[in-house]
């Protein structure tokens, strides 16, 4: 659970821009993430997530704007407080997991040896088996174990579910929640396009699309002003009069309308009508609705 503090933001971007020739990967991105949370960086493949992570980890320089970690510009001082687990396993010629963990022990000042051992057992990873004999899922799990046990003030996982089966993915998310409960001062940032899968884990979410900020806030804050309303066209129209419509479709003769509320109280008013059915809008569905809206705006422009 997120505990408010006066610490500097874990990650802050101000007008952050990155161009590759004529291609714009980040387009004036602005957001701020408070420290001590489990944060989701959510977006489609190609949205700019990996470019952003390369900038905040010092692997890539921005074209314009500012990027800060823990209140300071990205640099050697901030990178010493960061652990970035990328989406492509690369063990640099190390022979086995034991050698890899020995390197991690030297890299991270707050390395948690006991946790590392427990996680290796939990994910069924043998220390002495050659890494070339590890499956892709095992290699990914080894990296995730290192991130969890790093003790780093800011720990970032880029597409952590790649190669993992459903059981191992759920196990990983459970371990992130447990680690944050033990160490509430740490910030965990999970970059992914699998929004429904990670939603239950998050205290805060940053949605980006086309290199721009789409929305940010806690999952509850972001979804509470959206509602799915279904029924006859006449009843749905009456119940949602005066509200913005993001999308509507007809399913088996029933009109399904996704709407943006003017205030949370609108949901109770609609439910009180008794003539329509309502359902909350998931974080995944909200992302789809917002990206569709942005695409419609671009097409209209």
Short names for language-model regions:
Residues 86-143:
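ABC-family P-loop ATPase nucleotide-binding domains
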Residues 173, 177-261:
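ABC transporter nucleotide-binding domain
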């Amino acid at each position: 659970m997120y505990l408010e503090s006066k610490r500097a933001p874990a990650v802050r971007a101000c007008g952050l821009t990155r161009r590759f020739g004529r291609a714009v990967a980040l387009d004036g991105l602005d957001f701020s993430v408070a420290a001590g949370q489990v944060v989701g960086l959510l977006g489609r493949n190609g949205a700019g997530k990996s470019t952003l992570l390369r900038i905040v980890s010092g692997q890539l320089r921005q074209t314009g704007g500012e990027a800060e970690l823990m209140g300071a510009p990205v640099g050697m001082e901030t990178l010493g407080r960061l652990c970035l687990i990328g989406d492509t396993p690369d063990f640099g010629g190390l022979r086995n997991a034991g050698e890899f963990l020995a390197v991690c022990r030297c890299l991270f000042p707050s390395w948690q040896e006991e946790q590392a051992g427990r996680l290796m057992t939990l994910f069924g990873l043998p220390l002495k088996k050659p890494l070339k004999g590890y499956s892709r899922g095992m290699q990914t799990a080894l990296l995730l174990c290192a991130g969890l046990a790093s003790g780093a003030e800011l720990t970032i996982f880029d597409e952590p579910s790649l190669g993992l089966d459903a059981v191992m993915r759920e196990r990983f998310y459970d371990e992130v929640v447990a680690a944050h409960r033990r160490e509430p001062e740490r910030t965990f940032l999970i970059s992914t396009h699998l929004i429904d899968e990670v939603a239950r884990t998050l205290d805060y979410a940053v949605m980006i699309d086309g290199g721009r900020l789409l929305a940010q806030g806690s999952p509850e804050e972001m979804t509470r002003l959206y509602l799915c309303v279904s029924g006859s066209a006449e009843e749905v129209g009456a119940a949602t009069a005066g509200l913005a419509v993001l999308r509507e479709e007809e399913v088996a003769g029933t009109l399904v309308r996704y709407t943006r509320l003017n205030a949370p109280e609108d949901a109770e008013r609609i439910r009180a009508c008794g003539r329509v059915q309502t359902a909350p809008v998931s974080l995944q569905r909200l992302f789809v609705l917002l990206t569709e809206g942005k695409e419609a705006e671009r097409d209209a422009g």
